[in-house]
Amino acid sequence: MILYISDIQPIILFSTIQLFRSDPPLGKMAADKEFPMPADGIRCGFTAVFCNKRTCPYCRQMKKLAKAIRLIPTLLLFLHKNGMGMNDRIRIKDIAAKAGVSVGTVDRVLHKRPNVSKSAREKVERILREIDYRPNAYASALACNKDYVFCCILPEHASEAYWEEIELGAMKAVELRRDFHLNIRLRHFSRLHPETYLETCRRCLEEKPDGIVLVPTTVEETKAFTDELHRQDIPFVLLDSNMPDLEPLSFYGQDSFQSGYFAARMLMLIARKEESILLVRQTFEGKVTSRQQENREVGFRRYMEEHYPEVEIKTLNLPMGKDKAAYHELLEDFFHANPGIHHCFTTNSRAYITGGFLLETNRRNVQIMGYDMVPKNAECMRRGSISFLIAQHAYQQGFSSIDALFRNIVLKKEVRPINYMPIELLSKENVDFYHRTRI
């Protein structure tokens, strides 16, 4: 019989509880400075002072503990003989003996290999059910000694951006599972050049990945790629935007519609008396650059229509790929033409563009609601130009997406198909308590 520490922990715990429940309790006596301690020349084995072994309360308690410990082997033997859950290791040869088949037959059944007769398979499966056999997925994966390649297809981005947080989380997940021979490949496409998306996807397939983390673009382009992934039986996880019709293994991200709805509600707590507010969008050729931003805007406008239909929403598009001077010129023109605007909602992680402009032009009467705890946004929040940020836990998304591929492909486990990130509101007062590594 093989004994584990986990087997005797409950017994030791029970014995210790009984000891400390005694009267007087040992813990209480240790805290008391004054207690009856007759000294007749015998050194106490517990307190290192002179005592009478027969009357010393410390020695009496230690004798009880020693007696309880001496009972542990007897209790273990009793539990083992009565089949009370001792964690004996079940070997393949034990299963084969119980089923009356060969070890090779059991191995083929466990690993779902062919060349096993129906009767032999039924015998083995019956024994597996009886003993509640559960294979050690981690041990099997380690023994397999196979190299796995996971590809992440993400938009190109500047340093300290939302997507960099996702990359850091993904790389951390691989680092923590390096014993399983995981490898990650980061591949990027340009949102300024949509044709690079399918080209990046094609190059990714040439690497023969075992799994893919994917940020969708248009439905048509994304579906063309995911259809090929299904044909090649390559699992994929979606980030940023959920497209259930594509049948991904899993999705990680916020409910964009609810996020926009929530943002409008929070903003109007401080802007309920305003006649108009500003909505800032990041666009390319006049269109928003992601379905996520599009859904946020839909949710935002839905709340405003339902609760503040009289408030005018003015829209300002900031084209992608422009420099700081170009953005500041657009913002200066807007605020010069609309001096009554005091509240702004940005649909992406670049709230710092507007926030930085407000700081440089000393406009202290405009409050911004934006997205993502990237460093530039956090700095604007600390300096007062951004009032609120909605955190998306980008680092956690990157980590969890790789973890989902690992659990499904390597450990052969089921994963949850939809995983919404919390909609967490940050302000100047709690921004320093936000931790990206909360996993």
Roles of regions detected by a PLM:
Residues C44, C51, C56-C59:
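Cysteine-centered motifs
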Residues L71-C144:
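N-terminal helix-turn-helix DNA-binding module of bacterial transcription factors
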Residues I131, K287-V288, M304, H393-I439:
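Hinge/cleft segment of the Venus flytrap/periplasmic-binding protein
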Residues N136-T196:
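Amphipathic helical "hinge" segments at domain boundaries
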Residues P155-E164, R185-T196, G253-S259, R281-G299, ...:
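Hinge/beta->alpha junction and helix N-cap segments in small-molecule ligand-binding domains
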Residues G211-H230, K314-K376:
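Hydrophobic alpha-helical
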Residues E220-Q258, V374-R382:
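Flexible loop/hinge segments that line or gate small-molecule binding clefts
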Residues F251-I277, Y327, H393-V410:
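Hydrophobic alpha-helical segments within soluble ligand-binding/sensing domains
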